């Protein structure tokens, strides 16, 4: 957990019984408004911590509390970073208030940056499309972006929507065709669904009465073989029941990629 008060610029790690993990909290001297991402970078069997801060930095803190590296961007990082294992490399990715999306190597070097048209508050997510890793993120400019591991636009992307993208993009095979659909929400109260080529799925967008305020969560709630899409608005929780068979297994289908909320995802290529 990252601290955001003037006197609490620390990262906290807490055991299940409420006690501090040995060596924590660690004073990093930077305010952290969003969550962290976890992955064992030094292969010692203990997760390390990636965080973004209001000091414009994306940083890696090792499990012993040592700051391993820090990369300076052009403005505040107010989205939780994500760690994407492509099978060939580890990427650390996050959006910034300087309108740019950054992906770094596991050593903290810049792999690429991508300039959008507004602030990026959504955490990135990833999926395998056509045998390659695809990285998705949204911006306050209303666009959903999809890039490859070198920062190039994927065919059919970006897609402009009618409102700012307010949560991370999620993926599931909602129509049982063997390929993932791209699910998102925006500040115009729209639930959106796209194919991998950027074409919109039938019956979407579905418009709610109030703006959406978070990331979709997709799973088969009632065990009937089709999927439900859970979305939160500024007023209510909405559940959309898909009427064809589908699966969310193996996809980034929930906030931070998994039920442990680690922000880590391994793409099978």
Model-assigned labels for residue ranges:
Residues 1-269:
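Extracytoplasmic/lumenal domain signature
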């Amino acid at each position: 957990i990252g601290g955001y008060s003037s006197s609490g610029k620390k990262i906290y790690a807490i055991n299940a019984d409420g006690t501090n993990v040995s060596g924590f909290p660690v004073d990093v001297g930077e305010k952290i408004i969003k969550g962290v991402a976890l992955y064992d970078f030094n292969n010692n069997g203990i997760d390390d911590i990636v965080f973004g801060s209001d000091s414009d930095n994306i940083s890696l803190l090792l499990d012993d509390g040592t700051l391993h590296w820090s990369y300076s961007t052009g403005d505040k990082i107010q989205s939780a970073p994500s760690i994407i294992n492509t099978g060939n490399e580890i990427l650390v990715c996050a959006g910034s208030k300087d309108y740019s999306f950054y992906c770094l190597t596991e050593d903290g070097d810049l792999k690429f940056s991508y300039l959008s048209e507004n602030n990026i508050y959504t955490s990135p997510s990833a999926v395998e499309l056509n045998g390659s890793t695809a990285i998705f993120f949204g911006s306050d400019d209303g666009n959903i972006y999809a890039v490859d591991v070198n920062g190039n636009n994927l065919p059919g992307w970006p897609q402009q929507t009618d409102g700012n993208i307010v949560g991370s993009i999620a993926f599931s095979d909602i129509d049982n065709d063997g390929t993932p659909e791209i699910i998102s929400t925006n500040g115009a109260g729209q639930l959106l669904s796209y194919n991998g080529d950027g074409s919109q799925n039938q019956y979407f967008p579905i418009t709610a009465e109030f703006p959406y305020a978070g990331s979709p969560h997709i799973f088969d709630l009632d065990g009937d073989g089709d999927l439900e899409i859970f979305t939160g608005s500024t007023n209510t929780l909405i559940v959309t029941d898909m009427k064809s068979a589908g699966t969310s297994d193996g996809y980034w289908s929930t906030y931070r990629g998994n039920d442990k909320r680690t922000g880590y995802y391994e793409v099978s290529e």
